[in-house]
Curated annotation (Swiss-Prot):
GO terms for molecular function: ATP binding; DNA binding; zinc ion binding. PANTHER family: TRANSCRIPTIONAL REPRESSOR NRDR. A zinc finger (unnamed) spans 3-34. Its cofactor is Zn(2+). This is Transcriptional repressor NrdR. Residues 49-139 form the ATP-cone domain. Belongs to the NrdR family. The lineage of its organism: Bacteria, Pseudomonadati, Thermodesulfobacteriota, Desulfuromonadia, Desulfuromonadales. Disulfide bonds: none annotated. The keyword Signal does not apply. Keywords: ATP-binding, DNA-binding, Metal-binding, Nucleotide-binding, Repressor, Transcription, Transcription regulation, Zinc, Zinc-finger. One of its GO terms (biological process) is negative regulation of DNA-templated transcription. It comes from the Bacteria. HAMAP family: NrdR (MF_00440). It comes from Syntrophotalea carbinolica (strain DSM 2380 / NBRC 103641 / GraBd1).
Length: 157
């Protein structure tokens, strides 16, 4: 592997460890020329399906894009980045286990909405408003009424 510091092509592995969840390997390497050390990670390439967009375009699943959408919905809410990453990890696992080569974007959007619905109702409504493209306040109100009918609560601040 090429050294990130000097660009020399010969490095040696000085330590290898299995990652916490057993799905990656952490390696400490040392450059044979400059003798500096660096870390690399190895993991099995995910075989995620292509995403079919509303306009029928196909594109690879983009974990960062999904995390970004959830983060925007959870902005200023008590939801940690670790929780958001768990949602996306679960989604990726479901996509892999489905065995599908292509999947519609609406299935991903619905899975995120389901996860947010159970996690944080404000984040859920924010995400739903973008995902479902609410046009006016009446659509917001209809969604809020559904949440309240399911046993959600509104508290006074």
């Amino acid at each position: 592997m090429k050294c990130p510091f000097c660009g020399f092509a010969d490095t040696r592995v000085i330590d290898s460890r299995l990652g916490k969840e057993g799905n990656n390997i952490r390696r400490r390497r040392e450059c044979s020329q400059c003798e500096r050390r660096f870390t690399t990670f190895e993991r099995v390439e995910d075989m995620l399906p292509l995403i079919i967009k509303k306009d029928a375009r196909r594109q690879p699943f983009d974990r960062k894009k999904v995390i970004g959408g959830i983060q925007r919905a959870c902005e200023k809410r008590p939801v940690s980045i670790a929780t958001i990453e768990k949602i996306v990890d679960t989604l990726e696992r479901q996509l892999q286990e489905s065995g599908e080569r292509e999947i519609e974007s609406k299935i991903i959007g619905q899975a995120v909405m389901d996860a947010l619905h159970d996690l944080d109702q404000v984040a859920y409504v924010r995400f739903a408003s973008v995902y479902r493209q609410f046009k006016d306040i009446n659509e917001f109100m209809a969604e809020l009424k559904d949440i309240l009918a399911e046993g959600g609560n509104v508290r006074d601040n």
